[in-house]
């Protein structure tokens, strides 16, 4: 189950095209005619942290320093070439060699050439993330491996006037795992009919068919005589509306998975709603139910919730079995000049198609308070809690993290100090999981420099520096 890092963002506010999401390509029919528009930032970041429990164990604690260097992005450019970047990738080095140096982070990026009115659009996207070897063990480099997924392919648009468009697309995806034998190739084709209603609203009918083939034939569970691939088919109808104070997406349909010649289906839904209830306050709710794989889950809405140095794991721990993902999220954001408050939570279930003993549920909550002390001086307090449960084994963990950050903005650069701690308790039940129980205290300093755009300085930039075990990176 994924552990949500940093302040949780509304799933409808961050949208990266991915396999199975053709509707995110050129959703608006017609065009404004305006030139490229850019928002957000790309930062260089570096930091040094001290932890009194680098191994994240209950006993035999070992202190260590952790150096970090990398980049942090929350950037969007819209135009003939549209670019979206969200996340971070860091290089970690443990000074006392508690673990070997490694890359760590969670990143989603895509580049889309062409506009909805063009007959051809081309997508290139990449997702980089971390997978858990033991789902309940501490998130140290010894229990993590990186996973990368690249997706590319064309979208062919046939526009009928300014209100109707027919789209065909074909995508190729490649998932690569650092050590696990689950690397695969995905071929997906689909079609979409979109009709613009009134204003900034549209209605679309979508269908897709994806084939995922493992490079190692033994990776398909129950595969003898059943080939090396599985299939996911999906059909849905979707409404999108953009109003002055409200954004809404409502998609309903049905999806089917065929794995090792065993077929099963379930309803699909995707609900995203955000509303500004005052000039300073926005509330949001969301819900999602779909079939996914580990690599594909990194591109799902719940994988895009971390930014500005945070990092996430993909859904569950690394296995070749796809799963049914169900998620509900809600929260509110208050921003009134000197003060910011964000409260959010997520409840999620992963139901595995072939390994039901790994079915799990996860609940997370996050509260972030920020205050501008001076025009360029910020303070922020973040409190984060999570609960994860594998009911088949009666195994679970629960944790709480708190961090205080003080930051100073100097033109394109920012400096910060932070201190905090994590307390986690776990029980392995009747499983072989290493359900970690530990506590640790961390302090650190960081530096960021805006390479592109400018980060929104609210006291939290660089929080946790993407270091495993530090607050914000459970």
Question: Model features per residue range: what roles?
Answer:
Residues 22-474:
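Gram-negative and organellar
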Residues 1-8:
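Bacterial N-terminal signal peptides that target proteins for export
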Residues 8-16:
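Bacterial N-terminal signal peptides
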